[in-house]
Amino acid sequence: MNILLICGSPRKQGNTAQILRQLSIALEGETVTMVSLAELHLNGCLGCSVCQSDLEKPGCVQQDDITALLQQVMEADAVVYGTPLYGHSYSGQLKLFMDRHVALFK
């Protein structure tokens, strides 16, 4: 099984990252990849809908790390999102990434 762990914390070595690392250990024997959104260059969604023009693959006019990350999401059998709670909600980093998921919805 191919499992993608996405760490939505702005702190690369914070509690969320530690929890996801423990999960990775518990999933020994599976193919596990962990991605820290804090280490990626991701811009906010422009709402231009260009990503909806190609039905075969996700695309975006922005030149950032989203294309590679969305490819990992599509190839994964399971995706686990980890985030700290700030202001009774998930982190801004995870919100930004979730907004960019629109490229997957055709």
Short names for language-model regions:
Residues M1-L104:
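N-terminal beta1-alpha1-beta2 submodule of the flavodoxin-like/Rossmannoid cofactor-binding fold
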